[in-house]
Every structure is written in C-alpha cells, then in structure tokens.
Amino acid sequence: MLGFVNGRLHFMESLAPGLTALQLTLRTGDRTLMESLDLALEPGEVLGILGANGAGKSTLLNVLAGLAAPAQGRVTLDGHALETLAPLTRAQRIGLLPQGDEGGFFGSVADFVALGRYPFGHDSGDLTPHLATWELTELAPRPLATLSGGERQRARLAQLAVQAPCIALLDEPLTHLDPAHQARLLAWARREADAGHSVVLTLHDPNWAACHCDRLLFLHGDGRWQLGTPADLLTPDSLEALYGSGTAALWRRNERVQPV
C-alpha cells in the first residue's frame, strides 16, 4: 500500500501490526540526531540500540513510547498513529523503563511495583512472583526511597513485568545492576521475546549485544544510523566509527554472535 508521509510517497509499512517507525527524524536544537529511520519491531525479537552518550537513544525510546514527537516521520501502533491513541491505550501495549529516579515516590516497594497495572484499571493481583523474580520479597514493605540504586532498578523492572506489555522499551536497563542481575535481566528479555513480545534495549557493551540481541540499531548522533544483525554490525571498524578511536578493544569477537 502506498501513502504520503511529509509530502513524500512511501510504502505504508506503518500499517503493519505492532510498533513501526516510518521515515523518523530526530533533532535537538539545530542538530540532527537521526534521519529517515524506517523500523518495524518484530514480535519475538530483542533489538539492541547502541550509540555514544547524547546520540539520541533515549530520545528515540521516548518517541517510540509516544512521550515525545519526532521532528519528521511517524510512529504507528497496529496501524494507528501513536499520537491519536489515548495514553492509557498506549500503556496497555507499550511499556517504557526510563533512566532516572521515580519523581519523589514516597510509598513502599510493593506499592511502586503494583503501579504497573494502573493502565488496566484493576488491582495488581498477586505480586509475589514478580517480587521473587527480582529478589524484592524482603524489601517489599520498605519505602522505595531507602533502597540502593541497584535495588531501585530491580523495582523498576518488577513494575514493568507487572505491566506485562507486548512491547517493552528499556533505556539502559543494566545501569546499577550487579553482574548476576544483569544476566537475569537479559534472560528475562529473551523469555519475553520467546513469548512473542518485542523487546528494545539501549546498551553500551557490544558483548552483551552480541549474545542477547537479534538485531542492532547503531545511532551515530549525526543523522546516520545502521540497522542489522550482530554479525553484520559488530566489527572493530564499525565500533570505532560509532564510539571513537580505541574502542574496538571493547569487542571480544566470538564465533557465536547469535542470541542465547
């Protein structure tokens, strides 16, 4: 099907089910972060987004979640323009794990985790398995503000799990987590994908990306982007182009670059 976007004729891939970006351009001030991205999130995949600080990763997730508008292009959810959908409707399908704090939340850990069911207008049900998964059972009655950074990150992840979105957007979810919980998070992402959901992670470590992502999106922060498999994109030259001279040492190439 053909249609016009920003005055240009395109195949209307945006009418496909799921979350789709068509000719998406992001800018901050007079700087173009990303230009003319076409992206369809596939059910059953983990997509990793890599780029230097300030390259537009968080901005892109906010646009995909419907919390910010692109400079050009459009985002659709099941064929509907994202901006035409009510916030609660979006939240029933799309979950966003942002960076940062909780905006002065003063309740308990259990209360915070239960907010994941707010878009559905009914009680949160049994939180026990989610609290157990993220090792929050003993912390549940404590005020969220008394937790360490890693414990709060686990509470955010539990809240997202309670929301149970079919499209999960996670902004630097490995932040503050110890190695055991980083591995647990990435295993959770794979289980979600295996259940037919779409998972998007912003990452910095190419080795995690190689092992746990089906596709990668590189954002160069100057309008350029690359989309492909880990085998296609994870090379010393591409990493130095993405992050700068000397950063190829971050990549320990392994024969196995497919998701585990």
Q: Predicted segment positions?
A:
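Helix-to-loop junction immediately C-terminal to a conserved catalytic motif
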Residues: A65
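H-loop/switch region of ABC-family ATPase nucleotide-binding domains
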Residues: L203-H204
